Every structure is written in structure tokens, then in C-alpha cells.
Amino acid sequence: MRYFFQPKADSPLAKIFIIILIAVIGVLGYLVFNWEKPTNNVEGDIELGNVNASAGSDQKFNYLVSQTSNNCGLQRQVVFNYSDNQRIQGSCCDKMDHHAYQEQIEGLRKYKDISIIPTDPYDISAGQAKQLFKYFEEIKLTSDQQATYNEAMKMSDEGGPCCCKCWHWDAYEGLAKKLIVDYGWNSEQIAQLWDFSDACGGTGHEHAA
């Protein structure tokens, strides 16, 4: 005696049952393998990285923190071979820190009317870097101007434009020369700009005044 309905294996009803069963298994398999997995963001639940996001934003940080085109071994001679649109992104040494990055960008906003100052030290075009290299190579400081530069080196967190003698050092030395000669900047102004423009990564940073 049968206690439940059991169609014959070769009956049309059995074939329909098998087709439905296969379809259900297929749907379940699709859901299992395509289930949306959480994304591991750098800062917990903040938004995903976006190359086009504004400087200092969570999205821009999450993009830049994984970029490696900026590094200690990169020299200006190499950057001169880049196309002007190519970008040098990320930190050269330590991992970028979210809070320090935002503090730096906030500090740099005070210079927004000086177009030669990069707005984001962790994302600079090769074209802008080449312009700063030009200042580095062509501007000769007087003895008084050199004294201002040397004093700025003593005052800055990194002991100069960067933590290492790389493309960034040369670029920001050139920028400092330009600002001293054509804008009359003093050593304190140069040192603070360098601190805001640090691209070495890590937690050290300068607070905006």
C-alpha cells in the first residue's frame, strides 16, 4: 500500500516532476555561486575607491591606498619619460593613513589660489611633476634664499621635501625654490607646505591652522 503519491518513472507527470526538480536545483546553484559578498574596505564601511573622487574624500583615499606608481626608487629622469597625463599615485614608503590624508588635504586647501602647488600629494600628474622639475633644475638661489631653504629643511617633519631622495624630493625642492624666489615665502611657510605635501604615508601629519 502506497502512503504518498508516486508517479511511474516513465509517465508524463514524472518527467515534468524531474524537469521542475532540475530547474529548482539550477536556481539554487546560481544563488549560491553568485551571492553578493561583502567588500573589504580599507576603513571598514566607508565607500569604495573612486579615481575620480575629490581629493580628501573617503572614496579617493580608498582608491589611492592601493596604488603603487609612487615609490622610493622612482627618480625624476624616469618621470620625464612619462606622458604628461600619466599619474603618480599612492605613498612611497608607509601605508597611507586615512585621518592623516584628510588633514593634509585640508591643510593644502589654503593654497588653492596658487596653481603650481599640487592639491593632492598622493595623486600628481607627470606633467605637473615635470614643471616642478624645471624649477628644480633652473632656479638658482641667492645665499639668503638658500639660507631660507636650509632653515625650512630643519623645520620640516621629514628633514626636507620628502623622506627619501626620490622624484618627490626633486619636485618639491623645485616648488620651494619657486615659492621662495617668486612669492617671497619664508622658511616656516615652506616647511609647513612640505609637511602638508608629504607622500610618504604613515600617521604623522600637520594640522591646518
Question: Which residues fall in each region the model found?
Answer:
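Hydrophobic membrane-insertion alpha-helices, especially the h-region
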Residues: F17-Y30
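Ser/Thr/Pro/Gly-rich low-complexity linker/stalk segments immediately outside membranes or between
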Residues: N34-G56
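Short, thiol/selenol-centered motifs that function as redox-active sites or metal-ligating centers
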Residues: S69, G90-M96, G159-Y172, G204-H205
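Second-shell loop/turn segments in exported
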Residues: F133-I139, M155-K165, L175-D182
